[in-house]
Amino acid sequence: MSFHQGAPTPHNEAKPGDFAKTVLMPGDPLRAKYIAETYLENATCVNQVRGMLAYTGQYKGCPVSIMGSGMGIPSMGIYSYELYAFYGVENIIRIGTAGAASDEIEMMDVILADRSYSTSDYAQIQSGFTGNCLPASPELNAIITETSKSTDLHLVTGAVSSGGVFYKEEMQREPEPYMKEVKALEMESFALFANAKALGKKGACLVTVTDNKRTGELLTPEQRKTHLGKMFTLALESAIRM
């Protein structure tokens, strides 16, 4: 059931035309503010509803928008759907943080998701998709991969797991079979890819590893906002090629 059919929405006060065709979506709205103020020229705040800040400006003369997604599949599901369906956005790149899920992954590695696994029923309820794996846009991933070659960033490409629970009790349970393929754990990409598939749009996901349960390492909240510059730059350089 759809409760709303146009812009602005109950969650986004931006007017039609306020967003660029390509939007970068960190989870944290304060990270969106930091990126806009640090990297964009003529950045204008186009949404403040519920504190989910969104900005549109120029990067190297090209229009780019940045908006927080909030945490988790439902939040990303709402905001990315509205951007695609009501604001004419064509491309969304999630730029987030993640936990390492493989011994080969190190802190601060940047991972480009080629697919997202989840046990969530989001896609089934939203559009009837019954699988547990959704792909990123191959077109966007190709642009991001090619763009990374002109940087000193080591980009790791592979699967991520998009979970629905952050805090969970320790129980004896068998991991999902797909976990042996997964390089990082995050909480939003499955909803983004589901919306892109349902609406005929494009979605990609870049994450920087900021937590490692095996070693106990983790970044502080301030570091998560300011220490992810290589990923931010890669996303912006890729965005202007889309």
Name every feature range the model reports, one short phrase each.
Residues 1-133, 138-143:
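Metabolite-binding pocket within alpha/beta catalytic cores that recognizes anionic/polar moieties
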Residues 29, 99, 161-166, 191, ...:
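Glycine-rich beta-alpha junction loops
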Residues 41-48, 152-159, 242:
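Flexible, glycine/charged-enriched surface loops at secondary-structure junctions
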Residues 130-179:
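Active-site rim beta-loop-alpha module in soluble metabolic enzymes
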Residues 143-151, 195, 234-242:
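Generic non-transmembrane alpha-helical segments
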Residues 181-184:
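Short pre-catalytic strand/loop immediately N-terminal to key active-site residues, enriched for Gly-Thr
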Residues 190-223:
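Zn-dependent metallopeptidase/amidohydrolase metal-coordination segment
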Residues 213-242:
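His/Asp/Glu-rich mid-to-C-terminal helical/loop segments that flank catalytic regions of hydrolases
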